[in-house]
Amino acid sequence: MKKEHIEPFFATLKAANPQPNTELEYTSVFELLTAVLLSAQATDVGVNKATRKLFPVANTPQQILDLGLEGLERYIQTIGLYRSKARHLMETCRILVDQHHSVVPRTREALEALPGVGRKTANVVLNVAFGEPTMAVDTHIFRVGNRTGLAPGKTPYEVEMKLMQRIPPEYLVDAHHWLILHGRYVCQARKPLCWQCAVSDYCSFKPKTAKP
């Protein structure tokens, strides 16, 4: 993607969706952290189905601890890797209660010290909950960054660094949502919907797919 195409690329995405947000359902920072932790290798739809049952019963660190490991597993067993996720969430809740007064920390260092929370999860929480200009590179953003030529890279971290450098500051806080949604619904993995893509003119992907 040419440098002069980056601004209109994001301006177009913004015009179509001025106030983007995550599709994970949450009402507090802790609920967001929990949902993101559960979302690894799972769909937002699947996570939402589980948390709609979990959160009315337990939506604080202490309430999760009170469920016990087996109790928590019963609520999230429809999600992939639920046993390890349950263990990580229980350990995270114990740290939040013991070290952070049950409050989700606002620093990357403290977030990444929580079990099951890596760089991507920390970036999501920092961006969505606290409005920090971070870029959580998931499979959708990795694909869009490479396919469009916006931020080609061999690793998620490399794509993240290029995106942080290339995205105009005024778009950075919301760029994470625009790129995820674009990858999820338009620039799809198996067959991108180029014929209905609003930013196709700015994209470096050559074999544009035609309308069926």
Where is each model-derived feature located?
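Catalytic cores of DNA base-excision repair glycosylases
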Residues: 2-212
